[in-house]
């Protein structure tokens, strides 16, 4: 990457990078304004990767031992977001996002994360293959043409909260060609353990009442799962069969 630094004797500086990279991911053009002339030190950065209509802003402020970060963007590649956050890449696609962090002595104390991602894949998890064993979904050749361990999705919304080393998954909403999903849970960041409950249903209106509950647990890199075939699911299935036999 190439850079340009414009220093100001009053403590206000401009730093520019072209073709920048972080954690092996291209970040494109970055323009950063640094102001250390006041009691509250600030850094404002604008990121523009080599993609259409995508932009992100990074705002950092620091006073004494307290710091605050706001990182937000529109239509930003998820692979670049995970690279910037230095977290495992489990998702592709582009997202509108907003991240707010509070730090004390450079240690993260609280955080809030909102993502609205579109047209990507959940990596390492094939929900379609899993749900097709229990739900009457449109499991045709188009959907299974590239049978692998990923889940293509049309839209994925999530809202997460961080406090005391625990990341609470407040909301997950998922839409794929054949499935709708909703869920919540928690992630222990110390040992990267996940515990998430997700309900799946078919996008077909005929079967929307049939809801499949699944619990994902253990390592976030390769989660185990348990399908909860409870009395409620069996009752829904019986009612569906009765309707089909009429």
Residue ranges and their predicted role:
Residues 148, 198-229:
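Surface-exposed, gly/pro-biased binding rims or lids
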Residues 88-90:
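Outer-membrane beta-barrel proteins
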